[in-house]
Design a protein with these regions (language model features):
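Phosphate- and other anionic-substrate recognition elements at nucleic-acid/protein interfaces
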Residues: 66-233
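Functional cation/ligand-contacting sites centered on basic and imidazole/sulfhydryl donors
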Residues: 1-68
Length: 233
């Protein structure tokens, strides 16, 4: 065994994975087969991909996602837009409890749509006693009119969440939550498709794109929440 193979074996072991064919590792494109230490699930891909994803076991993620005992909502994740928004609920442990798409008639005035989305968020927060909302931040759009509308929507939602609902707010840029969830793609549609495929792999279900993205936005936001100091009650 050479040093490169030894280093990879050590890393995989530290991450809870057993490499079954370490001698096949020659370069980043080498395909290696592993088994997770928890349940023995087989993980097989290129070294490059496995390093990017920290040797994650999708089957273990599926088991965790399905093994929900606490059904009390804590987090609300919002991939918000004035027409179609993806929404997901999670318990305090970060397990998905539910998801939906909230659509508003495009014929309605912009501010009417904003008000409708605002009311829906208020309803969800109050009915479920939500303690933390995770909201995707905006980034500059080539279309200045669209960017202006998204900025106005963000302002209304942030004010509502912080000042009216008095709920903790976590925001995340799209590049941040996609990188955390290993969602890649050069084009926007590629990224959407990657989110859908990842959701299908974890939940064994066909989840629409806006809902899939709200789920992975939520996972990242929960990671941020768990790694920042929390105020004591």
């Amino acid at each position: 065994m050479n040093q490169k193979q030894s280093n990879l074996l050590t890393l995989a072991t530290r991450l809870g994975v057993n490499i079954l064919n370490i001698y096949d590792y020659q370069n980043k494109d080498s395909v290696i087969k592993c088994s997770c230490s928890s349940h023995g699930h087989i993980i097989e891909n290129t070294v490059d991909y496995l390093l990017k994803t920290n040797f994650e076991c999708i089957e273990c993620m599926h088991l965790k996602a399905m093994d929900v005992t606490d059904t009390t909502p804590f987090f609300l994740s919002l991939d918000a837009a004035s027409y179609v928004s993806g929404m997901s609920l999670f318990n305090k442990e970060g397990q998905l409890l539910g998801h939906k798409t909230f659509s508003i008639d495009k014929k309605k005035d912009f501010f009417e749509r904003v008000e409708e989305l605002k009311r829906e968020i208020e309803k969800i927060v109050r009915e479920n006693n939500i303690q933390c909302i995770i909201l995707e931040d905006i980034q500059y759009q080539q279309n200045p009119v669209l960017f202006k509308k998204l900025a106005m929507l963000q302002g209304v939602l942030r004010y509502t969440i912080i000042n009216e609902l008095k709920v903790q707010l976590i925001t995340a840029m799209a590049d941040e939550w996609r990188a955390y969830n290993h969602i890649y793609g050069a084009k926007r549609q590629d990224q959407k498709n990657a989110a859908i495929e990842r959701a299908r792999a974890i939940f064994k279900d066909n989840i629409p794109e806006d809902e899939s993205e709200s789920i992975f936005l939520g996972y990242y936001g929960i990671y941020v929440y768990n790694n920042e100091p929390q105020e004591e009650d």
